[in-house]
């Protein structure tokens, strides 16, 4: 961890960047590359985009197939950043991501290029658009004690404990996300203030003008088909072997990397003595659920411009999205 990131507040990057987001498997990567190529061609190279990954799993080295990192051909089409930052046994916080993101944006702007964030991790998106305050440093003794209580009494008791000090966080945090519940308890204990109160300050932060934040909106049946196809391709490309290789590393995987969709299901199948390939259906189910959560999050961001319905992989649909984004970006450049 960067030593100065745990308690450092981060200002929004809203005014300085382009953002392309959307649920998993919605086609963000290819669309971003098409936009970058089209914008450079339209401006005779005066506006060149560099892409910053907005994905919490792509930061991990060796977690390539399951996180759908850009291929080598895609990486060659535009500079990419914020990929392969840490080892899969490391934890990597939102604050650490934003520390790296701010440094990347500054470097890109100093070289007179255009930074474009591409991805769908909600907490990263929130930090980019509205800023972030990491709060007090971790209290390892307190965390260990709470984790022991969690093992003994279960996550329901942990949620009830959080409800007593921060009912808003208890209601908002995903029911299975013990890590965020513990952090909320830790924050309240250290500051005497619920973390939800602090977050409200950032939720209400807005840029002084309308920005370049785009979201792909894909009809649910089409998105489900894409997810099924993507999972099938991931297993064909060697996702099981990738997970087995990660489990064979000299250090155990971090909690974040072990719980990533696409990895967790195979790890659980191996632990249960089942054939890893049997996890494919669970990966599809959990990926669909992840996409629904992402869509819910995206609806809460008033900054976002919804792109037209991206209903297929056909050239006209993709061309329409590219044209919409490029025209809007150019209108802000005038």
UniProtKB/Swiss-Prot annotation:
Keyword Magnesium: yes
EC number of the protein: 2.5.1.75
A GO BP annotation: tRNA modification
InterPro entries linked: Dimethylallyltransferase (IPR039657), IPT (IPR018022), P-loop_NTPase (IPR027417)
MF GO annotations: ATP binding; tRNA dimethylallyltransferase activity
Record-marked site positions (Interaction with substrate tRNA): 121, 143
Pfam families assigned: IPPT
Residues engaged in binding substrate: 24-29
Top class in the EC scheme: transferase
Highest taxon of source: Bacteria
Reaction(s) the record says it catalyses: adenosine(37) in tRNA + dimethylallyl diphosphate = N(6)-dimethylallyladenosine(37) in tRNA + diphosphate
PANTHER family: TRNA DIMETHYLALLYLTRANSFERASE
Subunit structure: Monomer.
Family assignment from sequence similarity: Belongs to the IPP transferase family.
HAMAP family found in the cross-reference section: IPP_trans
Protein name (Swiss-Prot/TrEMBL): tRNA dimethylallyltransferase
């Amino acid at each position: 961890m960067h030593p100065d990131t745990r308690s450092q507040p981060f200002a929004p990057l809203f005014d300085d960047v382009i953002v392309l987001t959307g649920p998993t498997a919605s086609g963000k990567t290819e669309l971003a590359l098409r936009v970058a190529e089209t914008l450079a061609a339209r401006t005779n190279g005066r506006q060149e985009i560099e892409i910053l990954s907005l994905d919490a799993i792509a930061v991990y080295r060796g977690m390539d197939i399951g996180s759908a990192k850009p291929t080598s051909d895609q990486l060659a089409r535009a500079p990419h950043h914020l990929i392969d930052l840490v080892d899969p046994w490391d934890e990597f916080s939102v604050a650490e991501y934003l520390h790296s993101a701010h440094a990347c944006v500054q470097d890109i702007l100093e070289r007179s290029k255009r930074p474009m964030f591409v991805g769908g991790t909600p907490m990263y998106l929130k930090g980019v658009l509205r800023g972030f305050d990491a709060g007090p440093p971790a209290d390892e003794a307190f965390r260990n004690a709470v984790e022991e209580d969690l093992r003994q009494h279960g996550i329901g008791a942990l949620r009830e404990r959080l409800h007593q000090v921060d009912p808003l966080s208890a209601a908002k945090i995903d029911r299975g996300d013990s890590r965020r519940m513990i952090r909320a308890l830790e924050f309240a204990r250290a500051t005497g203030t619920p973390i939800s109160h602090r977050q409200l300050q950032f939720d209400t932060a807005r840029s002084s003008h309308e920005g370049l934040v785009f979201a792909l909106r894909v009809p649910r049946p089409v998105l489900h088909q894409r997810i099924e196809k993507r999972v099938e391709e991931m297993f064909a490309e060697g996702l099981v072997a990738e997970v087995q290789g990660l489990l064979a590393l000299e250090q155990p995987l971090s909690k974040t990397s072990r719980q990533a969709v696409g990895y967790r299901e195979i790890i659980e199948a191996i632990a249960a003595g089942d054939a890893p390939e049997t996890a494919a259906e669970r990966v599809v189910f959990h990926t669909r659920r992840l996409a629904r959560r992402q869509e819910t999050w995206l609806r809460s961001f008033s900054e976002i411009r919804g792109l037209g319905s991206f209903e297929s992989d056909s050239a006209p649909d993709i061309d329409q999205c590219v044209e919409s984004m490029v025209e809007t970006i150019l209108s802000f450049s005038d």
